[in-house]
Amino acid sequence: MAELPVTELPGDALCSGRFTISTLMGGDEPPPAACDSSQPSHLTHGSTLYMRTFGYNTIDVVPAYEHYANSALPGEPRKVRPTLADLHSFLKQEGSHLHALAFDGRQGRELTDGLVEDETGTNSEKSPGEPVRFGWVKGVMIRCMLNIWGVILYLRLPWITAQAGIVLTWLIILLSVMVTSITGLSISAISTNGKVKSGGTYFLISRSLGPELGGSIGLIFAFANAVGVAMHTVGFAETVRDLLQEYGTPIVDPINDIRIIGVVTVTVLLAISLAGMEWESKAQVLFFLVIMVSFANYLVGTLIPASEDKASKGFYSYHGDIFVQNLVPDWRGIDGSFFGMFSIFFPSATGILAGANISGDLKDPAVAIPKGTLMAIFWTTISYLAISATIGSCVVRDASGDVNDTMTPGPGPCEGLACGYGWNFTECSQQRSCRYGLINYYQTMSMVSAFAPLITAGIFGATLSSALACLVSAAKVFQCLCEDQLYPLIGFFGKGYGKNREPVRGYLLAYAIAVAFIIIAELNTIAPIISNFFLCSYALINFSCFHASITNSPGWRPSFRYYSKWAALFGAVISVVIMFLLTWWAALIAIGVVLFLLLYVIYKKPEVNWGSSVQAGSYNLALSYSVGLNEVEDHIKNYRPQCLVLTGPPNFRPALVDFVSTFTQNLSLMICGHVLIGPGKQRVPELRLIASGHTKWLNKRKIKAFYSDVIAEDLRSGVQILMQASGLGRMKPNILVVGFKRNWQSAHPATVEDYIGVLHDAFDFNYGVCVMRMREGLNVSEALQTHTTPEALIQEEQASTIFQSEQGKKTIDIYWLFDDGGLTLLIPYLLHRKKRWGKCKIRVFVGGQINRMDEERKAIISLLSKFRLGFHEVHVLPDINQKPQAEHTKRFEDMIAPFRLNDGFKDEATVTEMRRDCPWKISDEEINKNRIKSLRQVRLSEILLDYSRDAALIILTLPIGRKGKCPSSLYMAWLETLSQDLRPPVLLIRGNQENVLTFYCQ
């Protein structure tokens, strides 16, 4: 714990207790009312510090709900725990800061306060302006049951029972329920893995799988619900139209009657929605009661003895032989098959997302969604099984409906179960002309019921409740999608109104879509696509649960435990299979739309971070493959140039970053290293902000690289840390890339000594080394500070982006003067594979003797062909060993003159002291020992000017200065001489003298 100094108390504040804890801020806290000797003085009510930290004098705090919530409670400032710096670093006596950390007038709201919601809070006393919130029964179970029940229950389930038989019908029901139950378990797991806000299915998928899949599903799910409003409304309108025609009172004509009734109905539903969720919920309860009454009416009807009219239509109340006959299938018609019946029934098992879609209007979504959804699935399944079994026990498959078809004495045979009940339907049964019976009459439930109009009312309730649920779901899901701004031009519809933040604009948009499809009246074509959109949602919900489980992320901790990742995977696969079983072409369209929207979001790359399981999966894959690389032994064929680039802040040297990323992009590792020089205590607070900003800059520039920074006392020690600690396992840098130090002649000699020391350290650590020089320089920050003219700034901008543009039909000149293992050849080969450098011609220059030029050229060409690099143009330099021109030699001598010791006539003690104080200076002995190397660099600079003045890039072997024998100033003079007069960028490369190229296949 971080201890606070105890301020002295005035004498009159002292009590008789043995221990006394003073207040943190002296007069800022109220003094104790009195000293009570019956308890230690540090337990008095005046010490709020005790309430927080068990009486210890510390700013550390106990666990509290508010420390983990995203926002504060309404009307109260947000509480935060002390930072690590507050606890660990030197404590400053800043009264306001300490008081904010330690003093809490609420006397320690601790972990038990987690019962209070942090944003949509549900306090025990409801405030006047508090939004309406629903429990699991009214908010989820009833809503899901109403959305699951539909016209198929009333008009198609008896027919499916007649076709498939009771046994296979139960199998169809249970298979459908298995899919929805697995999805319900997945929803329950996802919805209990953290606080769920508004947005329903879209929110669950997007926060689990990320914005890419979540955004695409959210958009099509909202659209599917909007069209679902039209589908259910048209179902209601068709029933009303049939009633009008039955009583001879049509409005206009059959098609326009549907349009008129549909538009009027959806307008009424819109008005209910706009009235608020409270009124919408009351309407749903009313519809639920109507359906319950219709069910009771049906069950009572099955118990009433059949009238003559009902008997003529095939109803004879419960009989065992009818039940036995209807156990087995009797396939008829085009759809007469198991999968045909399954495809017709399955949509009636969907609708389980209705409760989750209003997650923002639930009191406790984590409790309401699992309990309400699973209970809705259970009770609707019971209702389907019960209706299938009861109606299959009461009604025969074929009946004429003619009351005159009673049994009469005569020679004609009588076939079928009806014969045993005094009815002869043999003729219509043989001719397949029966109009009634379980397999022929869709209104069988109405016929069986005690009062047929109540079944019609049930159909009305089922269709209207489903339409209302779809209208609310479409608007709520779309509102959340708009707020996340994953797609353009939709933010207008995200605004909420009133205490419940009702999506009024979303309601109006869903209303417009519904009216459009009602007027089009071509729902038979669009309905299969909509069904597949819902199945896409089921598949992705199940996959979300599976993926979150399989990644083993510590953040996946659902409080609902009754799920299985393998069951979720099965649910995802079977949902896709069912899509194709229902309508294969609609499945292809649905998947195509999802992929299109997915690719759009991937292309746009929205700046959101929801901690998705995709991110966790990426980490798992990266970790698994990184560990797996440890088992792979190094091989020349698998060599990759993995670069540690000393960029400092990457945006200071954009050209260097661009150049290296050209040959490492999608190929190998690139780390941008940054050494922050200074005392660690002062620089540590900068690290996190600096790293985040530079990583964003790399991402914005589309550079696939890592950023790594260290704090060190000087550059050299910092780079040593980077070279030893950067990377992971086999993914460690093997090349150090640095920019050329242009100001070496005017800079402090110690910095030059550090710079050359970095190169020596790289060779000691078995790194290859690349030194990059551009005539304009690499550090744009210097240019921004020194240049003031617009022309100069434009030139710097062009130089900083030179490697982002195509290099044209110039040349890449490689001076492969010394064999370093092949790195000098490999890097230009990798560059040439990129589009920007693909048009450049590569020329290879090697040293040689004038009398053996052809032989040496052929030998190098043969070697290059074995390397399969595609380099065919080779030039031998026979004059490389000639003496340089005198003027160039003189310029080199003038360059090193300020750095010479001139120790020829000085005593040994003086020379030793000078060398100790100025190790970068060059003695006369070192001049003489390195004279041949120095002249070689001068001569090579002349050759570079002769051959490569107009090249796009010059690559040559980096000379090596022996440690202790070549002072830093002399080595810098070599590099300066090689590159100072060249217009093209120059890259000096020296590998670690190990092979990186091979012509063997193993």
From Swiss-Prot:
The keyword Hydrolase does not apply. The modification Phosphoserine is found at residues 41, 47, 71, 89, 124. It is found in: Cell membrane; Apical cell membrane. The keyword Cell division does not apply. Ubiquitinated; ubiquitination is essential for regulation of endocytosis. Phosphorylated at Thr-53, Thr-58 and Ser-71 by OXSR1/OSR1 and STK39/SPAK downstream of WNK4, promoting its activity. Phosphorylated in response to IL18. Homodimer; adopts a domain-swap conformation at the scissor helices connecting the transmembrane domain and C-terminal domain. Interacts with KLHL3. Interacts with IL18R1; this interaction is increased by IL18 treatment. This is Solute carrier family 12 member 3. Electroneutral sodium and chloride ion cotransporter, which acts as a key mediator of sodium and chloride reabsorption in kidney distal convoluted tubules. Also acts as a receptor for the pro-inflammatory cytokine IL18, thereby contributing to IL18-induced cytokine production, including IFNG, IL6, IL18 and CCL2. May act either independently of IL18R1, or in a complex with IL18R1. It comes from Mus musculus (Mouse). Changing residue 71 to A: Reduced phosphorylation by OXSR1/OSR1 and STK39/SPAK. No effect on MAPK1/3 (ERK1/2) phosphorylation in response to IL18, with or without IL12. The gene is Slc12a3. Residues 613-628 are annotated as: Scissor helix. Glycans are attached at residues 404, 424. Expressed predominantly in kidney, including in distal tubules (at protein level). Detected at low levels in heart, lung and liver. Not detected in normal aorta, but abundantly expressed in fatty streaks and advanced atherosclerotic lesions. In atherosclerotic lesions, expressed in macrophages, smooth muscle cells and endothelial cells (at protein level). Chloride binds at residues 351-353, 538. The chain crosses the membrane at residues 136-165, 166-187, 219-241, 254-278, 279-301, 337-358, 370-391, 452-475, 506-520, 526-542, 566-585, 586-597. Changing residue 611 to S: Does not affect protein processing and glycosylation. Decreases localization at the plasma membrane and affinity for sodium and chloride ions. It is a multi-pass membrane protein. It catalyses: chloride(out) + Na(+)(out) = chloride(in) + Na(+)(in). InterPro entries: AA-permease/SLC12A_dom (IPR004841), AA_permease_N (IPR013612), SLC12_C (IPR018491), SLC12A3 (IPR002948), SLC12A_fam (IPR004842). Keywords: ATP-binding, Cell membrane, Chloride, Disulfide bond, Glycoprotein, Ion transport, Membrane, Metal-binding, Nucleotide-binding, Phosphoprotein, Sodium, Sodium transport, Symport, Transmembrane, Transmembrane helix, Transport, Ubl conjugation. Interaction between the cytoplasmic N-terminal and C-terminal domains (NTD and CTD, respectively) is essential for SLC12A3/NCC transporter activity. Phosphorylation by OXSR1/OSR1 and STK39/SPAK may activate SLC12A3/NCC by facilitating this interaction.
